[in-house]
Design a protein with these regions (language model features):
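FMN-binding flavodoxin-like domain, especially the glycine-rich phosphate-binding loop
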Residues: 4, 10-13, 17-32, 37-132
Length: 132
């Protein structure tokens, strides 16, 4: 599993909480600035988080996601506070055809991180991201 963040302090806290919530599963947490295109290939499940929409560190990640098909992979998105950041992340993964969890995680709901993260991993929502 892979968690990619913008590297912001609050986003990193949520990423750590998600990784901890997944228990014994191997989870790699990466700042987007350290992301390489082949990091995402072995990940059946990945999470993306940012504090604000269009962080500069996401430029390469955005380019990769525009040119890769990740159909069948599961994805959860999160932000410490920004609905616009979540809208950005949702649009970012739209073209790569991931199965996007319909409910993003916000910092205000960090108490429910474990349930949310496990739901993303289980794929029980199984809705392909068809929104435009």
């Amino acid at each position: 599993m892979l968690i990619i963040t913008d590297g912001a302090k609050e986003t990193a806290k949520i990423a750590s909480a998600i990784a901890a919530a997944l228990g014994d599963v191997k989870v790699e947490v990466k700042a987007a600035g350290d992301f390489m295109g082949n990091d995402i290939l072995p990940a059946d499940v990945f999470f993306l988080g940012c504090e604000n929409p269009e962080p500069e560190t996401f430029a390469y990640l955005a380019d990769v996601l525009r040119h890769i098909n990740l159909a069948g992979r599961l994805c959860g998105i999160f932000s410490p506070k920004s609905e616009k950041a979540v809208q950005y992340l949702s649009a970012l993964v739209h073209d790569c055809e991931v199965a996007l969890h319909p409910e993003p995680l916000f910092a205000s709901s960090v108490d429910s991180v474990k349930t949310w993260a496990q739901n993303v991993v289980s794929g029980s929502f199984c809705t392909r991201n068809d929104s435009k």
